[in-house]
């Protein structure tokens, strides 16, 4: 008989969970408190009210009680449930607040959720799936993955994680890595621009008017500080912007208010393993100027936080509270305005 997950979780103490998967899979990952043995071994042990869990494709004796969806079903349920329950305040509420406060989704939008395979974009996909089920504003979603030339095992990891999390991905191929591997200068900058161009182009080809990227709160404040320290200017990563090269297309960042540490907590709680940077250049190079600057900025923020716990939020809020009368100059629509222009003697 099939025992539904909700019933099991509600009445855990009534069952003894028997995991019949192979030993290697069990040792790699299992439900706490479960016993690894075969159905026959469980019968020999005369375990009271055993509930069997295996692979979703396993065929069970009709006389056995087995968990709906198998081990994969349990992992999916736990990952989805933890977004709206255990980490509701840290993830779900921050996501919906960003969508609302920054007006990221409008009626009848068709959004391409761009998945790189990392923790941020995978979580974003699950948040969109949850929002799509409950939103009062009608919108459509495509979950797209651009393969810039990943090694086979990296591509497989993305596909396996999408299957495990029940994300209906669409994969399209490019050879961006081959192009940037041959560049001597600024490969990361060029790679990022090429990626975005391909994402915009593919999204538009399937009828989307927006692409969603997985940049989070920490990305935004690091970018703010980097622009000052390394670029000699004041600007930040906005929660949305219109494309300059693809008319009618817009980029949105729904994770804008979510802290990276909370994404990591969700990932680790669910024992998920996502793709890290799989760039050929990063793997082959001893130094990466763009990445090292971001890392240095991240360390600086961490150091400042030791004496000022509010430093991260203060950096974030500084971009909402710019006093134009108290700056030497600023640009608006490519026109430079200097403080002396309106200074009266």
What kind of feature is each model-predicted range?
Residues 16-18, 51, 112-113:
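Conserved beta-strand elements of the Class I
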């Amino acid at each position: 008989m099939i025992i539904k997950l909700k019933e099991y979780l509600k009445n855990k103490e009534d069952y003894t969970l028997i995991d019949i998967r192979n030993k290697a899979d069990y040792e790699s990952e299992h439900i706490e408190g479960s016993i690894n043995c075969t159905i026959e071994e469980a019968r020999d042990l005369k375990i009271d009210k055993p509930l069997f869990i295996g692979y979703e494709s396993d065929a069970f004796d009709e006389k056995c009680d087995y968990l709906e969806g198998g081990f994969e079903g349990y992992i999916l349920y736990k990952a989805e449930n933890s977004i709206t329950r255990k980490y509701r305040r840290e993830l779900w509420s921050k996501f919906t607040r960003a969508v609302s406060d920054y007006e990221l989704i409008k009626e009848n939008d068709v959004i391409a959720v761009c998945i790189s395979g990392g923790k941020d974009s995978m979580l974003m996909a699950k948040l969109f799936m949850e929002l799509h089920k409950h939103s009062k504003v009608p919108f459509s979603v495509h979950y797209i993955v651009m393969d810039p030339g990943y090694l086979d095992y990296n591509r497989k990891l993305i596909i396996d994680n999408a299957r495990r999390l029940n994300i209906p991905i669409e994969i399209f191929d490019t050879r961006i890595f081959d192009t940037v591997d041959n560049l001597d200068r600024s490969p990361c900058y060029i790679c990022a621009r090429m990626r975005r161009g391909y994402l915009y182009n593919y999204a538009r080809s399937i009828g989307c008017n927006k692409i969603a990227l997985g940049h989070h709160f920490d990305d935004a404040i690091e970018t703010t500080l980097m622009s000052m320290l390394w670029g000699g200017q004041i600007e930040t990563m906005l929660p949305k912007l219109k494309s300059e090269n693809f008319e009618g297309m817009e980029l949105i960042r729904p994770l804008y208010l979510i802290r990276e540490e909370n994404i990591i907590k969700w990932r680790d709680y669910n024992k998920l393993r996502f793709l890290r940077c799989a760039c050929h250049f990063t793997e082959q190079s001893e130094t990466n100027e763009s990445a090292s600057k971001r890392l240095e900025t991240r360390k600086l923020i961490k150091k400042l936080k030791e004496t000022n716990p509010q430093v991260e939020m203060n950096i974030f809020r500084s971009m909402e509270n710019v006093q134009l009368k108290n700056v030497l100059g600023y640009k608006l629509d490519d026109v430079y305005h200097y403080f002396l222009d309106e200074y009266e003697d």
